[in-house]
Structure formats: structure tokens, C-alpha cells
């Protein structure tokens, strides 16, 4: 169900509150044979003339699987892992900074916590929002998880216990986006359909500053030193707000439609943006950069009439970028050549978020088909 702005209104009724037992983790292991289902003295060898790409031989005595095919590049149980359990569209997903777990959420208002390795079990469900969850972020050390919701609040969760430790209230409409500061006091910035960007200190009650924007704000992030907030929205501009002067210091122009995702590179020099004009751009946000800050434009991914907030992300080393796309594909580009490295199929709905694992060659995607995929890349 979408509101007039193209984003979901809050789901109503108990149908959107599945119990823990209703949530079933479904995992598809690509082309694998389970030796446990065979007699103990049997060895299994493909007998078809046309053999599969990956030939799997089950050695019964050692109870191990040996894969004959392309070399593995990650510690995932299989090259592709599928996780099901959400009752509605998945809008957001993030790896924990330690890489061992991940969180996902969306229209069903539930935050599901998953193991990355092994069987990828859904080991916890966090409840508390009364509206769709639009964005999730862990803080730098992974101790807290932040969630922005259409219930006009931002949840602050203890990622170890799953307890909600704070509820940030002050916005008067949907909160589309949130982002915690990388360093210093635990600040978080938020953006809303009420046309404001707010700055919060989780130790204090209420926002510590509000920046007034003219139009709805769809994406926010901090700069690397956490003394500036960058915001994008339906006015097609990226605005940079200075927290020491409490004012707008410059605006970056170039996109021809709403900006739905922002992501800062790990070293803090470049900003990535995803827009409904069907381009992804890299901007130089270093001090004293040239006035024309847009340094690269990437094409391939698509937005459509659904107007979902499609996000974007950097790999940890900055060599790759990824973006969500309404055409059901995961797009990954090389940042140097601007070439599409991967256009990954699998989802049956708009891919709303794609993120890179903090340590391994793994990408995670969440989509409107209610599913999450993890896959290893080269």
C-alpha cells in the first residue's frame, strides 16, 4: 500500500505481526546434495550425460561435500544464500560491523536478525515500530542499531540484547532515513517528509538541532568527521549542513530527479548518490574541492513508478559501488572504469538495498519480493 508520495503507509491490523514461530528461514543451497539423506555406504556421482556446472561428490565415510567447480571466494555455506521470513517488502538490510550477523526490515515493521554463516538462521525479531521501517544502520562499533520508520520515530536498539533503548520523537511525518556518526559522541541525523533534517544525541531527550529544508528529505549521511550532514530529497539537490555554524554551506547540483540514497566512502572523501533520474553519481566532498564536485556518473540501474527509496553503497576498499534497482537486478560497478561488473538476477521485485560485507567478497540485497539474498563475488 503506497501513499500519494509513493512510499508505504503504515500497515494495519494483526496480519502484519507474525509470531516468532511463523517466521521460517528458508535457505536454498545452490546445486548441493545432502549426504545425510543417503545411505551411509553410498557415494553419489552425477550420472547424467550433461553434467551440472558444479559437480558435487558426497563422501559418505567422512560426511563431507567436495565441490568441483569455480573456486569459492567467501565463507558462506554456499555461493548463494536465500533468506525468507519477512511478511512484506524488504526496504533495508545491513551487515553488523563484525560481519557475523545482519539486520533487515521493511513494510512488516519487524527487524529480523540473521546469522551470516552456517544456515543463516533468523535468531531474533525486534518489535516496536507501528509503521514500515525505511532504513537501518549500525553505529561504528555495532553496539547500537538505528531504525527510521513511517511511524515518525527513530528506534535505537541494543544489538546484543535486542532491547529498544531509546525512541527518538520529534518529526511530524514519515522518517525516511537515519545515519549515526562515525566518531565522537553518539550522534544520529535523520530526514523526514516533514521537510526537516534533525540532529540527535542519543544521551539527550529531543533533537539538539533542526535544519529546515523546503521539500521532503529522503536520504542523509554524515561526513567523515561528523561535523557536517549531507541530505538529499525530492528537490534533486544534495545539501551540506555545517554543525558548527548550524547552517547550509553548499549545495551540489546535477541530478534531474529525487535523490533516494546517499553513502559516504570509507575514507570519507567521496559521496555516492542514487537518484530517480536513473543515474548513480560520485561527488568529491573534500574541503576546498573544485566547485564542480560531481566526478563520475554511472548508469544501468532503473527507478520506476513505484518510487521506492533505492539505496546505494561502497565496498570497503572503495573499488566497487552497488545500487538498488527497480528492474529486479543487483548492479555492481567498478569505480575506476565505471564498467558494470555484475548484473545479478534472482529477485522477483524491486531491489531496494544492496550492501557489501565488511570483510569478505559478499553482497547482500533486500527486495520487494520479501526476500534477502547473499552472494559471493570475485
What are these regions (language model features)?
Residues 1-83:
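Intrinsically disordered terminal extensions that flank WD40 beta-propeller domains
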Residues 68-78, 113-135, 139-143, 153-177, ...:
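Per-blade loop-tip surfaces of WD-repeat and WD-like beta-propellers in eukaryotic adaptors/scaffolds
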Residues 83-107:
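Beta-strand-rich domains and repeat architectures in extracellular enzymes and scaffolds
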Residues 93-99, 136-142, 148, 179-185, ...:
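Loop/turn segments within WD40 beta-propeller blades
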Residues 303-332:
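Loop/turn-rich, solvent-exposed surfaces of beta-rich toroidal or solenoidal domains
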Residues 355-378:
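Blade-level signature of beta-propeller repeat domains, shared across WD40, Kelch, NHL, RCC1
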Amino acid at each position: 500500500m503506497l501513499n500519494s508520495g509513493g512510499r508505504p503507509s503504515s500497515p494495519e491490523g494483526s496480519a502484519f505481526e507474525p509470531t516468532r514461530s511463523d517466521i521460517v528461514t528458508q535457505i536454498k543451497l545452490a546445486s548441493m546434495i545432502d549426504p545425510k539423506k543417503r545411505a551411509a555406504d553410498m557415494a553419489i556421482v552425477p550420472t547424467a550425460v550433461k553434467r551440472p556446472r558444479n559437480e558435487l561428490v558426497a563422501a559418505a565415510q567422512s560426511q563431507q561435500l567436495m565441490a568441483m567447480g569455480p573456486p569459492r571466494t567467501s565463507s558462506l555455506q554456499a555461493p548463494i544464500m536465500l533468506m525468507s521470513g519477512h511478511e512484506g517488502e524488504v526496504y533495508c538490510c545491513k551487515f553488523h560491523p563484525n560481519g557475523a550477523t545482519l539486520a533487515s526490515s521493511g513494510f512488516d515493521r519487524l527487524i529480523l536478525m540473521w546469522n551470516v554463516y552456517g544456515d543463516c538462521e533468523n535468531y531474533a525479531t525486534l518489535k516496536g515500530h507501528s509503521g514500515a521501517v525505511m532504513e537501518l544502520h549500525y553505529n561504528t562499533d555495532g553496539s547500537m542499531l538505528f531504525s527510521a520508520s513511517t511511524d515518525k520515530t527513530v528506534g535505537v536498539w541494543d544489538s546484543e540484547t535486542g532491547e529498544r533503548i531509546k525512541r527518538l520523537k520529534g518529526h511530524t511525518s514519515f522518517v525516511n532515513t537515519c545515519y549515526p556518526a562515525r566518531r565522537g559522541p553518539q550522534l544520529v541525523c535523520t530526514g523526514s517528509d516533514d521537510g526537516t533534517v534533525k540532529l540527535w544525541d542519543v544521551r539527550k531527550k529531543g533533537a539538539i538541532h533542526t535544519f529546515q529544508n523546503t521539500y521532503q528529505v529522503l536520504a542523509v549521511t554524515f561526513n567523515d568527521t561528523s561535523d557536517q550532514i549531507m541530505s538529499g530529497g525530492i528537490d534533486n539537490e544534495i545539501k551540506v549542513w555545517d554543525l558548527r555554524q548550524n547552517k547550509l554551506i553548499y549545495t551540489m547540483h546535477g541530478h534531474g530527479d529525487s535523490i533516494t540514497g546517499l553513502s559516504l566512502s570509507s575514507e570519507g572523501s567521496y559521496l555516492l548518490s542514487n537518484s530517480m533520474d536513473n543515474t548513480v553519481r560520485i561527488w568529491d566532498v573534500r574541503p576546498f574541492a573544485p566547485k564542480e564536485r560531481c566526478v563520475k556518473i554511472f548508469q544501468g540501474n532503473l527507478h520506476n513508478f513505484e518510487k521506492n527509496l533505492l539505496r546505494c553503497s561502497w565496498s570497503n576498499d572503495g573499488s566497487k559501488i552497488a545500487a538498488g534497482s527497480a528492474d529486479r537486478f543487483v548492479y555492481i560497478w567498478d569505480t575506476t572504469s565505471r564498467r558494470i561488473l555484475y548484473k545479478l538476477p534472482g529477485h522477483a521485485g524491486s531491489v531496494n538495498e544492496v550492501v557489501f560485507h565488511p570483510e569478505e567478497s559478499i553482497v547482500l540485497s533486500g527486495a520487494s519480493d520479501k526476500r534477502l539474498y547473499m552472494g559471493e563475488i570475485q
